[in-house]
Amino acid sequence: MSESEYRSSISVRPTFNRTMQSTATYGSTISSGTSRTLKITEIGGSNLTSGMSPFGGHAASAIRESRTREKKEMSELNDRLASYIEKVRFLEAQNRKMEKDLNLLRGKWGHDSTSVKVMYETELRSAKDLIADSDKERAQLEDQIKKLVEELNNYRNKLHEAERGADVTRKELDNVLGRLGALEAEIELLKRRISLMEESIGHLKRENHRMIDSLHHARNAVEQETLNRIDYQNQVQTLLEECDFIRRIHDSEIHDLLAMASRDTTVENREYFKNELSSAIREIRSEYDHVSNTTRTDIESWYKLKVQEIHTQNSRNCLEQNYAREEVKRLRTTLGDMRGKMADLEGRNLLLEKQIEDLNYQMEEDMRSYEQSLNDKDTSINKLRDESKILMVELQMLIDTKQTLDAEIVIYRKMLDGEENRAGLRQLVEQVVKTTSIHQTKEIESLRVLKGETTSHSSYSRSAKGNIAIQEAEPSGKYIVLENISRRDENIGDWKLRRKIAGKREIVFTFPREFTLRAQKSVKIFARGQGVHSPPDSLVYDLEDSFGTGNDVVTTLYNKEGEDRASHSQRASHT
């Protein structure tokens, strides 16, 4: 066979696209203890990753599938090889019949060796050229992979910067929302104070109207007493005139008696009648003076007493009116200040709401741009990953081609070395079988339990129908605080405090008899061993170590008549 007639059978393997499927499967189940089960499937084997750790898993998946197909092809080739070996054995049996032809071939040994050498050198040059081209392509692919990795790192850095910016914006928004909540709470407090002041103003107005009515009644009483005084003065004048009339009558009678006495010539009779008349006159005068003095004294005393009462009532009414005027003036001033402050706070609240709207709009824009950049980066990353997978597959194919070529070169060398004996073909078959690579795949399942997070949500609500309110009910059941929101003391003796917990018994605390809660003060009721008994600021309930805890707790205050006066409810949920 001449050199020009020989053609090398070594060629570049045709490229083909392999479909890749991830071998890592994740399954999650939610257990009763709010835990999550994560199933991880790992792939192990002897696949070559060429040091590409970021894409090792995906490349291994592609190579595993290609190895599966190659294993199937290798099985078919093994079957073909087995049939070929049987054919070789048949040919070896025929070789015994072809010794004559072999002797002829041995006579032409030198010429045939030269032809085989030419064939070997031609194949070797082709293989070297192909290896050189493969090395060049591999270097180019490695450079491209480095550039892609650098670009991927840049995208990752930009992504981290965008995430940090989003975190900063989120923190600023949380701070603004916190300030807004504080301002809203302050506004609600001011509205509550204004409502309380308006109630106080209404109470003072009602008190003022009551005092004005009392003043009118007092004035009417003064006028009535004045009329009575005039009437009594008229009665006194009438009595005085009657006394004068009686005195004149008595004087006339005395004058008549004197005239009669003067007619009597007896000295003893004149003296007797004179003495009797003088005695009668003295008795009448003394009785008249006594009656007159008694009447005058009684009238003057009664008049002075009534005048003093009227003056006292008038002074008290004047003081109360002055106090009410001062209180109304002070409340109006405070109300004006509160309204001014409330207007300032409302303006500030509007400004903050405008800032929040601007920040929300800016945050939405940033989030949209951030999501768009994330989508673009994800698309770029997926594209780079696909390209990297393709490059890894092509690189693995080139490596496989190189290994196959190296194995074929070694086989040809051994074939030439073993041409002198009859076992050369058998060695060829054995080398082909020995160079077949076997890939094993094993699956490892690992069960990992991730403890879930627990979120607690609590809500409180309270109400009051009078001046006594339940200010606080400690969640762990250590104490309960009652508050007197009025400006006067409240007697809450024999009142009952009931605490109902879902699924548990009811706890009842009764206040001591004649217990008074002072104005604008509070009293704390401790469970046994949780505080100090110091009335009227604190009381201790000796019958219970705790007022109880639960997810649904209602605390209610009842007066002596069993009426609901205040309540406090607490509800908690856990997710």
Curated annotation (Swiss-Prot):
GO terms (BP aspect): heterochromatin formation; nuclear envelope organization; nuclear migration; nuclear pore localization; protein localization to nuclear envelope
Region of interest: Coil 1B: 120-257
GO molecular function: structural constituent of cytoskeleton
Entry's localization field: Cytoplasm
Domain IF rod, residue spans: 70-423
Keyword Cytoplasm included in the entry's annotation: yes
Chain positions covered by the region annotation Head: 1-73
Alphabetical list of Pfam families matching this protein: Filament (PF00038), LTD (PF00932)
Main location: cytoplasm
UniProt keyword Transmembrane present: no
Annotated region described as Coil 1A, given as residue ranges: 74-105
Region entry Linker 12, spans: 258-275
Tissue expression from the record: Expressed in the larva in the pharyngeal-intestinal valve, the rectum and some neurons of the tail. Highly expressed in the intestine of the newly formed dauer larva. Colocalizes with ifb-1. Not expressed in the intestine of normal developmental stages.
Annotated Gene Ontology cellular component terms: cytoplasm; intermediate filament; nuclear envelope; nuclear lamina
Region entry Linker 1, spans: 106-119
Residues covered by region (Tail): 424-572
Keyword terms: Coiled coil, Cytoplasm, Intermediate filament
Annotated ranges, domain LTD: 456-572
Coil 2 as annotated region, ranges: 276-423
Subunit and interaction comment: Probably forms some heteromeric filaments with ifb-1.
Family: Belongs to the intermediate filament family.
Function: Cytoplasmic intermediate filaments provide mechanical strength to cells. Non-essential protein.
Protein name: Intermediate filament protein ifa-4
Designated gene of the protein: ifa-4
